């Protein structure tokens, strides 16, 4: 399970998930990527389940990069506890994902194999996702520069 080694504060505010992803919205390592279409908190267990689903399908052929990390602790109070008495203890860790964020990257396999591996990973995640390729992003980048 992914989690920070050391944190400055054990408990953080929940925050808002407004707007699009400005960082991490392009493919930087691999040839294919899995892009988020909705905002969500992705838990470390969900990230690990998606990673295992992809690596089991591609076997030893390709390489997988995880481009999100769960930095945010989510607290929870024990069951049947009265209100008050402070905030609960940290229960699990989440990564805040906005629309347009590339969460996973993959290379070293064919496109149809990568597409199927990403489809298996999508089923492990609580949001709608989109399969993207490096060529698609280069074409979009070229069109933007011409205008």
UniProtKB/Swiss-Prot annotation:
Q: Name one Pfam family in it.
A: Ribosomal_L16
Q: Name one GO cellular component term.
A: cytosolic large ribosomal subunit
Q: Is Protease among this UniProt entry's keywords? A: no
* Location of region: Disordered: 1-20
TM region(s), chain numbering: none
Q: Which PROSITE patterns match?
A: RIBOSOMAL_L16_1, RIBOSOMAL_L16_2
Picking any one GO biological process from the record gives: translation
Subunit info here reads:
Part of the 50S ribosomal subunit.
Cited function: Binds 23S rRNA and is also seen to make contacts with the A and possibly P site tRNAs.
UniProt-recorded name of the protein: Large ribosomal subunit protein uL16
């Amino acid at each position: 399970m992914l989690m920070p080694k050391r944190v400055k504060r054990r408990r953080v505010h929940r925050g808002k998930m407004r707007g699009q992803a400005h960082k991490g919205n392009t493919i930087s390592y691999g040839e294919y990527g899995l892009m988020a279409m909705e905002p969500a908190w992705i838990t470390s267990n969900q990230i690990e389940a998606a990673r295992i689903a992809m690596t089991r399908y591609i076997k030893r052929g390709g390489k997988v990069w995880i481009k999100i990390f769960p930095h945010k602790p989510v607290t929870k109070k024990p069951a049947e506890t009265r209100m008050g008495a402070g905030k609960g203890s940290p229960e699990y860790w989440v990564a805040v994902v906005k629309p347009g964020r590339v969460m996973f990257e993959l290379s070293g396999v064919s496109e149809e194999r990568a597409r199927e591996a990403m489809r298996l990973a999508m089923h492990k995640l609580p949001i709608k996702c989109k399969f993207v390729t490096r060529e698609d992003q280069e074409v979009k980048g070229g069109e933007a520069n011409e205008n």
